[in-house]
């Protein structure tokens, strides 16, 4: 159900004469992987390669906060302290907008929001500014993710925790793809055991 149009890829591959196909994913569950294999490679032998998602260069940090005011205070401190580009993930478009304005005012950093409620041109502009080092921080919903590869993102903060482990891993996977040190912050809001 992630990308319904992908269900038609098997038909397209057959219409093209069954050329060689390479399917890659960083976050597919075993069930989704089985669906991909069934749809794309139903009548062919395939080779699967799996790699670890372990990223020893990324430090996961949990900060305990009591309320939203304390969370915002902590957020300001983290953003001021961290070096390099950063992402802050939200489950609310409104909160992403509000926090981007607040961080810009209180830190003097170059901050913008990114979410599906924005016009395409606005989102594209924010993405290009971030990729070219013209923004320090992006306050985003999960709309900021797929296909975005900025190797030097040094930290990811989860203001709100994603609903499932797959999205959590995908979002913090944006951090430090160049192999240098990175940090992931989240507040103690929901026990990590909820994902197990």
What residues fall within each predicted segment?
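Helicase motor core with emphasis on the C-terminal RecA-like subdomain
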Residues: 1-196
């Amino acid at each position: 159900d992630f990308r319904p149009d992908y269900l038609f890829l098997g038909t397209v591959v057959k219409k093209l004469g069954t050329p060689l196909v390479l399917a890659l994913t960083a976050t597919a569950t075993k069930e989704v992987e089985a669906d991909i294999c069934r749809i794309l490679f139903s009548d062919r032998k395939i080779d699967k390669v799996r790699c670890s998602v372990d990223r020893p260069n990324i430090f996961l940090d949990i900060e305990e906060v009591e309320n939203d005011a304390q969370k915002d205070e902590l957020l300001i401190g983290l953003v001021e302290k961290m070096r390099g580009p950063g992402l802050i993930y939200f489950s609310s478009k409104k909160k992403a907008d509000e926090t981007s304005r607040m961080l810009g005012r209180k830190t003097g950093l170059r901050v913008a929001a990114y979410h599906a409620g924005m016009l395409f041109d606005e989102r594209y502009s924010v993405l290009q500014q971030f990729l070219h080092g013209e923004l320090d921080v992006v306050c985003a919903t999960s709309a900021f993710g797929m296909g975005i590869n900025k190797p030097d993102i040094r930290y990811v903060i989860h203001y709100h925790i994603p609903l499932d482990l797959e999205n959590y891993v995908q979002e913090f996977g944006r951090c430090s793809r160049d192999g240098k040190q990175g940090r992931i912050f989240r507040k103690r809001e929901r026990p990590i055991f909820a994902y197990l």
